[in-house]
Swiss-Prot record:
Domain Peptidase S1, first and last residues per copy: 25-258
Pfam families: Trypsin (PF00089)
Protein name (record): Kallikrein 1-related peptidase b16
Keyword Hydrolase: yes
Sections of the chain in a coiled coil: none
Annotated keywords: Disulfide bond, Glycoprotein, Hydrolase, Protease, Serine protease, Signal, Zymogen
PANTHER family: KALLIKREIN-1, KALLIKREIN-RELATED
Species per Swiss-Prot/TrEMBL record: Mus musculus (Mouse)
Record keyword Disulfide bond present: yes
Signal peptide boundaries: 1-18
Positions of the pro-segment in this chain: 19-24
C-alpha cells in the first residue's frame, strides 16, 4: 500500500502541519504562456507552498491542508522565479478552511488507515481586489458533475521529481483522466468519499506533487476539482491521485463568499 502524500510544499515554520509533502507535477510539460489565467501561487513567508484558483476579484480557492496563519498570493505568473510586470501580488486578509475538514490529520507524519480527508478546500479573502487583465482572470465554479473518462488538465509549480523536491520555474501542465472513485478506494487505505475525484495520469511516472496542492483540475474546459492527495513518492505508474470534487461545495463556497464580502 502506497503512503499518502499531501501536495504541500514544505514543513511550515517548524510546525508539523502535514505529512511528508510533495507539490509539483512530475512528468508534466510547460504550460502555454498565459493559458491558465486563473492559476494562483500561494506563499508563506515568501516561500511558494501551494497552488490555488481565482474565483473572482476578491477570492481564491485552495486546499484546506495548505492552511497557515498568514499567507499571500501571486496572480498572473508564468514563471515562479522571474519578475513579471503583468503579475499581481496580494496579501490574504482571512482564510476560511471548510468546517468539515479534519485539521487534526495534519499532525500525523503518515495518515492513519481509514482517515477521512474529505472537504479539503479553503477560501482565501484577498486584502485588495485583483485587477482583471488578459493574464489574470477568474474561472467559474462547475454546475454539474464531470463525466467519467473525461480528459482533464492539472497545473502547478509543484515538484517535478518524485523523491527530491525540485521546483520548476515554468508553470507545469499535465493531462489526466477521471476514473470511478472505486479505483482510488482500492489503491488507498484512507476513506474515499463522493466529495472526491479520482484520476489516473495519462502516461508513466506522472502526477501532481509537492506544491501542487489546491491547484485547478480542468475537465473538458470546466473547473471541476482542486489537487488534494496522492501517492508517495509522486507519479507512481498506475496509482491514482485524489482531488476535491468542487460541484459538491458550490453552496458552501458561494455562501462563504457572500457572508464575508
Amino acid at each position: 500500500m502506497w503512503f499518502l502524500i499531501l501536495f504541500l510544499a514544505l514543513s511550515l515554520g517548524g510546525i508539523d502541519a502535514a505529512p511528508p509533502v510533495q507539490s509539483r507535477i512530475v512528468g508534466g510539460f510547460k504550460c502555454e504562456k498565459n493559458s491558465q489565467p486563473w492559476q494562483v501561487a500561494v506563499y508563506y513567508h515568501k516561500e511558494h507552498i501551494c497552488g490555488g484558483v481565482l474565483l473572482d476579484r476578491n477570492w481564491v480557492l485552495t486546499a484546506a491542508h495548505c492552511y497557515v496563519d498568514e499567507c499571500e498570493v501571486w496572480l498572473g505568473k508564468n514563471q515562479l522565479f522571474q519578475e513579471e510586470p503583468s503579475a499581481q501580488n496580494r496579501l490574504v486578509s482571512k482564510s476560511f478552511p471548510h468546517p468539515g475538514f479534519n485539521m487534526t490529520l495534519l499532525t500525523f507524519e503518515k495518515l492513519p488507515p481509514g482517515a477521512d480527508f474529505s472537504n479539503d478546500l479553503m477560501l482565501l479573502r484577498l486584502s485588495k481586489p485583483a485587477d482583471i487583465t488578459d493574464v489574470v482572470k477568474p474561472i467559474d465554479l462547475p454546475t454539474k458533475e464531470p463525466k467519467l473518462d473525461s480528459t482533464c488538465l492539472v497545473s502547478g509549480w509543484g515538484s517535478i521529481t518524485p523523491t527530491k523536491w525540485q521546483k520548476p520555474d515554468d508553470l507545469q501542465c499535465m493531462f489526466t483522466k477521471l476514473l470511478p472513485n472505486e479505483n482510488c478506494a482500492k489503491a488507498y487505505l484512507l476513506k474515499v468519499t463522493d466529495v472526491m475525484l479520482c484520476t489516473i495520469e495519462m502516461g508513466e511516472d506522472k502526477g501532481p506533487c509537492v506544491g501542487d496542492s489546491g491547484g485547478p483540475l480542468i475537465c473538458d474546459g470546466v473547473l471541476q476539482g482542486t489537487v488534494s492527495i496522492g501517492p508517495d513518492p509522486c507519479g507512481i505508474p498506475g496509482v491514482s491521485a485524489i482531488y476535491t470534487n468542487l460541484v459538491k461545495f458550490n453552496s458552501w463556497i458561494k455562501d462563504t463568499m457572500m457572508k464575508n464580502a
